[in-house]
Structure formats: C-alpha cells, structure tokens
C-alpha cells in the first residue's frame, strides 16, 4: 500500500497538492492520492532522473545550471536561484516546457518536547508551482491545529492572495443539524438532509483514516491591481454529501455549475455528473469497479469491453476503437491504439 489518502475534494478526486515525496536512505518514493508510487534512486544535489513509465522528471536542487544540451537546462534556468541552489528542495515535471512542481516542507509549531532546531522531515510536500516564464504559485500550509499541514492560502505571481476555506466532517455535520433545526421551525424552508445521516466522523479507507477535511470555498483576499475592489462572495464554493463526497460546485454568482451523484455502496464511485445547462451523463460499472458504459442522452454513448491485453471502446454509432495494453496491475500501459477510421 502507498500513501493515497482521501484528498480535499473527497474520495475519487485528485488535486495537484496531494503529491508527496518520501525520502528514504535507499530510495525516493513519489506518491499521489491516486495510489501511484514511483520509485527513484537517491539523488545527489543537482542530479536529475527520469521515469520512462510515468514520463516524469525528478530533480534535486543544489546546482545553478544543468549541463548544456540537457533536456531540462532551459527550464531549470527559469527557476529563481534560491530554489535551484537549495539541496533540500526537490522538483518534478512531466515536460521540458514545465511547469515545475516544487517539493519542500511546511513550517509547523514545535511541540513542548521537540528538540530545536527541528530536523527536516523525511518527506516533501508541494509548496509551489513555477512555469518556464517565471510565473509562480506559492502555497501556504497551516502550522498548527486540526488543519496542520493543509493548504489554506495561495499567492500567484501577480501578488494576488487567495484563501482556501477548509471544513471538517464535524463542522459540516453541525451545519446540517442547524439547517434541520431551522427547517423544522419554518415550514417554508426546504428540508435538508437528515442530520442523523450526517456523521461527525468518516470511516477509514484501505489506505488509512479519512480526516474529513474538504475544500469548501476559495476567496480572493488581496489584489494589488484592484485593492479596493475585492469580491464580496467566494470565487468558488463546494458542497459535499454526508459521506464526504463532492456533491456540487458553485461559481462566484452562487450558480451551480457542476453536480455529481455517487454509488451509495461504493464511496467515491461517481455514477453521474452534470454541467449547468447540459444533460446528465451516467456511468455503469462491472463488479471490479471498471466503467462498462457511459450514457449520454444528448450525444454519443460508449461501451467498454475489457480483455487480457486490450480494451474495446464502441460508441452508439457502432464505431470501434481498440486500446492494446502490456503489463499487469498498476504497471499496465497502453502501447497501441486502433482508431475507428483506421
């Protein structure tokens, strides 16, 4: 098992911030919350290594320049010197065009028994992004409390500051209880989900406990270009089911722009989704959790047939594509694709 915890959008969803690098004596292990575990040999300062199976570069800081002719030489030179020269930072990218994922560590409030100065942790987390033009995103993580280590602030290269509002399962359950109480006292208020169905904690997954921390809203807090014209509502808002699954997304006008439905027996298994103003797209699965049919009432639908080394995709016009695969389990890869038109 690899560290693949439920992320800030709930089970079944991945976010770039979920990337994590384990630093061991004999290996470097890059994990995401999709369960991928990419192993590298330990790196010397400034050294770079490439994973062919994942098309991913990993580079350790500690060198001002990469050798002439190196695939990443120009992209490396676009980084600020303090990042390039730090041997304690690691950087990952899947393209010579960028962007870089900057892997560092978050500050935390030391405990009463901690020895100071505290050593660096045996892992790295995403602390920022940088593209080949020098534009950056910097992530700020909570240093203490229930949200310690979670991203609660982002600053972009233009100096705009964003606040990420995170909620716990207990907070969402309390809000559900308040809404239910209000609905009982006012017959005109829509009846919310039963508070008894909204637990204060969530069950664990095969990878470990689900802390129930979810992203609820994104606010613009500072804009150097328009400091007096900040919006009075969040740029985006997210709601969740009683099981912590992403239920709906709202834009800054409080208009619902996305909606999702899940299988009650399989947390995080999405069976339908819808964009605002569009018909609902539905999915059917087999007993192993693979999608076997995608149903679109206003367009093309698809059927998926899984065989040992091939996946056949047939649309509702009876056109067929075939994906040929090699390998097994988590190392299975598509090696050839037959298109419907040859």
Residue ranges and their predicted role:
Residues 23:
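Phosphate-centric recognition/catalysis
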Residues 9-16, 26-342:
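Extended charged/polar low-complexity repeat regions
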């Amino acid at each position: 098992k690899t560290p693949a915890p439920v992320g800030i959008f709930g089970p079944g969803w991945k976010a770039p911030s979920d990337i994590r690098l384990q630093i061991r004596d004999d290996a470097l292990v890059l994990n995401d919350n999709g369960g991928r575990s990419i192993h590298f040999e330990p790196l010397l300062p400034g050294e770079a290594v490439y994973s062919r199976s994942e098309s991913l570069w990993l580079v350790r800081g500690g060198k001002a320049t990469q050798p002439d002719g190196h695939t990443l030489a120009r992209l490396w030179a676009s980084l600020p010197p303090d990042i390039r020269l730090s041997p304690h930072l690691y950087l990952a990218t899947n393209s010579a065009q960028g962007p870089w994922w900057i892997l560092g560590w978050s500050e935390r409030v030391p405990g009463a028994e901690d020895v100071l100065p505290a050593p660096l942790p045996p892992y790295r987390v995403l602390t920022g992004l940088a593209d080949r033009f020098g534009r950056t995103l910097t992530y700020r993580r909570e240093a203490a409390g229930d949200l310690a280590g979670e991203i609660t602030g982002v600053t972009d290269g233009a100096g705009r500051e964003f606040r990420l509002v995170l909620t716990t399962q207990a907070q969402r359950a309390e809000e559900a209880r308040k809404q239910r109480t209000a609905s009982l006292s006012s017959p005109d208020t829509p009846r919310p989900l039963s508070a008894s169905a909204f637990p204060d904690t969530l069950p664990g997954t095969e990878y470990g406990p689900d802390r129930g921390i979810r992203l609820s809203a994104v606010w613009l807090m500072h804009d150097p270009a328009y400091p007096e014209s900040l919006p009075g509502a969040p740029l985006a808002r997210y709601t969740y089911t009683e099981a912590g699954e992403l239920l709906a997304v709202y834009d800054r006008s409080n208009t619902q722009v996305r909606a999702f439905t899940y299988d009650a027996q399989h947390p995080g298994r999405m069976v339908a989704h819808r964009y605002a103003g569009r018909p609902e797209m539905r999915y059917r699965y087999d007993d192993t959790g693979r999608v076997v049919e995608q149903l679109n009432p206003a367009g093309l639908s698809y059927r998926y047939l899984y065989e040992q080394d091939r996946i056949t995709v047939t649309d509702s016009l009876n056109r067929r594509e075939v994906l040929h695969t090699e390998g097994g389990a988590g190392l299975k890869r598509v090696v050839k694709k037959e298109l419907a038109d040859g």
